[in-house]
């Protein structure tokens, strides 16, 4: 730059500072220390707008322009001082520095990566994280030399490019003709403080979250001088404005010159407080406020939409997503009057089998958190997690580890159990006190680690629910107690869960699509940064619930003494505040407290009220409001807070009424074909299906390849509710026996008018039996709910179903025994083999004993209202099956012939059986039973499997005989309908308990021969009584440990309906199987409850993925059968 340009730049900058920064200059002049260095921060955008020519000079000649700025600033300060009339208390400062910030956002000036060689000499803004800070040194930047010949004194400045070394002058620079080359250094005798400055080197690293996948973060050194020294520490996020320069060490002969690129800082901006790195404008805030205004009547539906967008590549796992979202939202850090700081960050530990999606949650959380570090336990040491002492250039420096780098952010540690024992103890202080104290290599300091830790680990071998978490994952109690939540994900062997998960994965692989209802990752990042600025306060109601729950945990007999300390109450408060943030609220309400207690109960820290739950199979609730109501009833009753419960129920009723008035919706109106009554789109205030829901939706063309027979006017429903989305759940620890879940089922129960016997009936009988048997163990539990008091289905349908179920169960055992004797094939597992044996046994008996009826003309199913007080509407899966079999197609013949092919493997030997025929009835059909027990005891057996079957109309039955029912059986059934069923009810109810023990003993005796056979184990498991004193083989416990069935109360409501309805319905509906007379009820089989040592509750706080008839909008068995 020439003198004119320097003068222009100086004048423009001096006038700019005098106009815009006069107050800042006055504050500097008031300071008492005249030798200190004072910065004046100038915004580059405002300066360049004043004069664009300065911007051009600044970009081309940054070092010269910065020197001119400092000189102009001193002149401006002197002018301001002189302009004051009474400059009392003001003094002129010589060490003033202009600090440039706020560069225009463009690739030429703002960088997120380390600069390269082409950037040397340019003024840039670089963002990074401090990983190392050196000690502050004293730098001599100039010296005075005197010529020995002419005594001329001149100044020599240190060369920055050669590590601030001084080069002795080669000749005298005086204007006189002096050729002397000998000089004397005057600074050796007394180095003036004015010729020295503070000097510090730091090392910054690229931010990992801003890099592409697989990139290794690079680092570079930054030179800090004067007032910039000690402006940052290890782990800080910085935006550094400076000039990119290169430097090398002095040349040596036969040595390579090593040049490095450094950044000479002009201004350092610490971004820890505003670590989000994004600007929160009013438009974004308004968008989220409108979102919550839309879900004002049902805020949990809005929260679930956010949770569905959290890690969408993982299917279901509602509870885990809720816990991760609460941990990311974070609590509020408090500092009391004494200075004690209580952490606000929550810690989460995911314990689960391999392949349960733990690492996916860690990766997603690290992506949406602006300041995050992702590491693994096997590759981390104590120093790598905390801080490392590194010797560089002959001195020791501290290099920050993962926890320090994640200060005010998130630290994800995968394979947490791989940490060595002495490395685990090093993070105790970091997790609780939020600091790290270091005394290494003579360096003693304390660093902040205000970070949220999200860890994942595998259990040590097979997870044993009988042992504590500390034993299962081999972690000490002091470390586990620092985690606010510990969720267990058990990969139970569940066929339906595996089918849905594989279908979801394969569908996404073949047809990748992006749902419009899911939030993008940028939107999620913006939302979580926004809600961290909220500071919700606890209400009196929430305080009462949290305090009462803490007291219940302390008084629990099975409490963990290391866990139920005051840390538990602090964890509850943090999580409640986090949930209030997630719900975009400024007050912690009762809803937040109830949700936090529910999540805590489902984690391994809780369990004092209802026991734990397998978080893997929790599903998104179809009705979030109904789930919250159920949680309120369960928790507040356990906590004995009846007044709060009544008040909250009244509030929920008021909200429900308001939403119904805004959008009237009748749940009793039958859904139109092709839709689902429980579809979330039809509910007021509920969200539309997300990508995971749409991935479950099956249309007839997609599922059956166009071969599915559909009747006129009926089409297969293609919607999918959230239970179906989240899969299997039949391997869950808790039984789905919550009574609050039954009204939904009762609404969908139907009564089909007894019409003509059509081909649809017969086809449907066969198909529905296959589907019912394919459901396996789950069907028993769901059917037991259907017959609770006040929820009995139609009498005729019940009678037919009872008789067919009884004969089916007896023949199922017959088929299993015969197949065990005639065939020793152990290649099929028990859970897959039992449904096939049940099906083939019943088919074999019917096909060998029953004549084939002539086909009749198909008629459409007619649905007539049964009378007042009855609700109409067919359940979803029943309507689907009816729609499938209305028009018999080629599949019908193939399905009928399939049992014949399977039957070729087995040989059934019919034996003579004991029969019992009441008065006025013909002989019992010869295919009634194969178990030769006392005939006086068998008719009175009526166990849960017979009593718990759902209503079976023309659209669903449990027999495979179909169109092979004989006319002789029809006559027997008509005669049977005249027999009153009440004659056997008193004895049946009295002797039900003793008879179950008789059956159990007989089954144990009959199965001793094939003790090791898988099918025999499965049969004994099916045939065991529900008594808690029963002994189950150890092999079967591995499959049934996660099931829990509760038998319904034995009352008259479970008995058969009155005689009039029974006889009227039976006169129109012939039995679908070789059913015996009513009085001769046969023994049936049911699954056994887990032993008492597994302390699991039958009530669930969260929606478990139970694939019942109403939850699934499609039948997996039917779909798999139709595919070639």
From Swiss-Prot:
Residues reported in the UniProt entry to bind ATP: 352-359
Record-linked SUPFAM superfamilies: Nucleic acid-binding proteins (SSF50249), P-loop containing nucleoside triphosphate hydrolases (SSF52540)
GO cellular component: chromosome; MCM8-MCM9 complex; nucleus
Cell compartments where the protein resides: Nucleus; Chromosome
InterPro entries listed in its UniProt record: AAA+_ATPase, MCM, MCM_dom, MCM_lid, MCM_OB, NA-bd_OB-fold, P-loop_NTPase
Pfam annotation, one family: MCM_lid
Quaternary structure annotation from Swiss-Prot or TrEMBL: Component of the MCM8-MCM9 complex, which forms a hexamer composed of MCM8 and MCM9. Interacts with the DNA mismatch repair (MMR) complex composed at least of MSH2, MSH3, MSH6, PMS1 and MLH1. Interacts with MLH1; the interaction recruits MLH1 to chromatin. Interacts with MSH2; the interaction recruits MCM9 to chromatin. Interacts with MSH6. Interacts with the MRN complex composed of MRE11, RAD50 and NBN/NBS1; the interaction recruits the MRN complex to DNA damage sites. Interacts with RAD51; the interaction recruits RAD51 to DNA damage sites.
Protein name (database record): DNA helicase MCM9
Organism: Rattus norvegicus (Rat)
Taxon lineage: Eukaryota, Metazoa, Chordata, Craniata, Vertebrata
Gene for this chain: Mcm9
């Amino acid at each position: 730059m020439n003198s004119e340009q320097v003068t222009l730049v100086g004048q423009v900058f001096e006038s700019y500072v005098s106009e815009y920064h006069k107050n800042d200059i006055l504050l500097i002049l008031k300071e008492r220390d005249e030798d200190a260095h004072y910065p004046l921060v100038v915004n580059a955008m405002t300066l360049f707008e004043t004069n664009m020519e300065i911007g051009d000079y600044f970009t081309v000649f940054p070092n010269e322009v910065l020197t001119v700025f400092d000189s102009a600033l001193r002149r401006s300060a002197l002018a301001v001082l002189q302009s004051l009339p009474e400059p009392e208390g003001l003094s002129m400062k010589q060490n003033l520095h202009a600090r440039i910030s706020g560069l225009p956002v463009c690739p030429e000036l703002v960088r997120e990566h380390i600069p390269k060689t082409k950037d040397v000499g340019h003024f840039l803004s670089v963002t990074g994280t401090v990983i190392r800070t050196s000690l502050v040194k004293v730098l001599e930047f100039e010296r005075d030399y005197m010529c020995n010949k002419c005594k001329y004194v001149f100044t020599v400045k240190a060369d920055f490019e050669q590590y601030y070394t001084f080069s002795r002058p080669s000749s005298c620079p005086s204007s006189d003709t002096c050729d002397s080359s000998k000089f004397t250094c005057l600074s050796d005798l007394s180095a003036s403080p004015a010729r020295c400055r503070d000097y510090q080197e730091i090392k910054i690293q690229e931010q990992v979250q801003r890099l592409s996948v697989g990139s290794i973060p690079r680092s570079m050194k930054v030179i800090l001088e004067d007032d910039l020294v000690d402006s940052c520490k290890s782990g800080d996020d910085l935006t550094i404005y400076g000039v990119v320069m290169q430097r090398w060490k002095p040349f040596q002969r036969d040595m390579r010159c090593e040049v490095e690129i450094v950044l000479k800082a002009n201004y350092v901006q610490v971004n820890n407080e505003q670590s989000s790195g994004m600007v929160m404008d009013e438009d974004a805030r308004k968008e989220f406020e409108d979102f919550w205004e839309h879900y004002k009547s049902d805020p949990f539906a809005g929260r679930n939409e956010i949770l569905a967008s959290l890690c969408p590549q993982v299917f279901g796992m509602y509870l885990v997503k809720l816990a991760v979202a609460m941990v990311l939202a974070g609590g509020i850090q408090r500092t009391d009057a004494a200075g004690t700081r209580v952490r606000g960050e929550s810690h989460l530990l995911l314990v689960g089998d391999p392949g349960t999606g733990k690492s996916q949650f860690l990766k997603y959380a690290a992506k949406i958190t602006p300041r995050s570090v992702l590491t693994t336990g096997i590759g981390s040491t104590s120093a790598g997690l905390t801080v490392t002492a590194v010797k560089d250039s002959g001195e020791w420096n501290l290099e920050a580890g993962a926890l320090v780098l994640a200060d005010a952010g998130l630290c994800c540690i995968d394979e947490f159990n791989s940490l060595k024992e002495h490395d685990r103890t090093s993070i105790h202080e970091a997790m609780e006190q939020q600091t790290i104290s270091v005394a290494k290599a003579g360096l003693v300091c304390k660093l902040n680690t205000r970070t949220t830790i999200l860890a994942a680990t595998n259990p040590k071998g097979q997870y044993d629910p009988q042992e504590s978490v500390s034993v299962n994952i081999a972690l000490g109690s002091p470390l586990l107690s620092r985690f606010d939540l510990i969720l267990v994900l058990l990969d139970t062997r569940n066929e339906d869960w595996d089918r849905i998960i594989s279908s979801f994965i394969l569908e996404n692989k073949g047809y990748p699509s992006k749902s419009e209802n899911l939030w993008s990752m940028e939107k999620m990042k913006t939302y979580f940064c926004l809600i961290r600025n909220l500071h919700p306060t606890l209400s009196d109601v929430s305080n009462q619930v949290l305090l009462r729950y803490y007291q219940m945990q302390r008084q629990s007999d099975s409490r963990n003494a290391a866990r139920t300390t005051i840390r538990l109450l602090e964890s509850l408060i943090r999580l409640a505040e986090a949930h209030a943030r997630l719900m975009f609220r400024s007050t912690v309400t009762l809803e937040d407290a109830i949700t936090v207690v529910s999540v805590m109960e489902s984690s391994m820290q809780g369990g004092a009220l209802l026991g734990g739950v397998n978080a893997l199979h929790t599903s998104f609730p179809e009705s979030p409001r109904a789930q919250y109501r159920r949680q309120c009833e369960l928790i507040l009753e356990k906590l004995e807070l009846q007044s709060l419960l009544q008040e909250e129920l009244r509030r929920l009723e008021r909200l429900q009424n308001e939403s119904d008035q805004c959008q009237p919706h009748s749940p009793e109106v039958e859904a139109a074909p092709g839709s689902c009554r429980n579809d979330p789109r039809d509910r007021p205030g509920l969200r539309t299906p997300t990508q995971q829901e749409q991935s479950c939706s099956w249309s007839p063309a997609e599922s059956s390849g166009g071969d599915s027979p559909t009747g006129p006017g009926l089409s297969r429903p293609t919607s999918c509710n959230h239970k179906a989305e989240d899969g299997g759940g039949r391997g869950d620890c808790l039984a789905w026996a919550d009574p609050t879940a039954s009204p939904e089922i009762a609404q969908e129960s139907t009564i089909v008018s007894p019409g003509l016997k059509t081909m649809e009936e017969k086809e449907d009988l066969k198909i529905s039996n296959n589907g019912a048997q394919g459901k396996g163990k789950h069907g028993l539990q769901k059917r037991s709910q259907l017959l609770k008091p006040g929820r009995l289905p139609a009498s005729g349908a019940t009678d037919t179903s009872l008789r067919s179920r009884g004969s089916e169960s007896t023949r199922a055992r017959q088929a299993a025994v015969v197949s065990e004797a005639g065939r020793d094939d152990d290649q099929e597992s028990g859970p897959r083999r039992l449904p096939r044996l049940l099906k083939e046994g019943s088919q074999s008996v019917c096909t060998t004993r029953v004549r084939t009826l002539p086909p009749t003309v198909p008629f459409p199913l007619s649905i007539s209202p049964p009378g007042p007080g009855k609700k109409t509407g067919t359940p979803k899966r029943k309507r689907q099956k009816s729609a499938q079999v209305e028009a018999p197609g080629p599949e019908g013949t193939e399905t009928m012939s399939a049992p014949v092919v399977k039957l070729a493997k087995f040989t059934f030997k019919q034996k003579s059986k004991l029969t019992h025929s009441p008065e006025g009835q013909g002989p019992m059909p010869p295919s009634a039973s194969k178990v030769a027990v006392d005939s006086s005891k068998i008719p009175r057996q009526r166990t849960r499997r017979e009593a718990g079957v759902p209503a079976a109309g023309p659209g669903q039955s449990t027999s495979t005989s179909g169109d092979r029912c004989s006319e002789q059986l029809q006559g027997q059934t008509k005669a049977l309908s005249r027999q009153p069923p009440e004659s056997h009810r008193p004895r049946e109810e009295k002797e039900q308990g003793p008879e179950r023990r008789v059956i159990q003993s007989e089954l144990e005796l009959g199965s001793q021969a094939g003790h090791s056979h898988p099918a025999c184990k499965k049969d004994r498991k099916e045939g065991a009584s529900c008594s808690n004193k029963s002994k189950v083989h150890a092999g079967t416990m591995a499959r049934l440990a996660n099931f829990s069935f509760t038998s319904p109360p034995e009352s008259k409501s479970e008995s058969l309906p009155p005689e009039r309805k029974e006889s009227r319905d039976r006169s129109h509906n012939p039995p679908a199987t070789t059913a015996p007379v009513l009085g001769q009820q046969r023994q049936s089989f049911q699954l056994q409850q887990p032993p008492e040592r597994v302390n699991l509750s039958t009530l669930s706080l969260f929606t478990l993925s139970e694939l019942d008839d109403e939850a699934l909008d499609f039948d997996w068995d039917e779909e798999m059968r139709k595919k070639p």
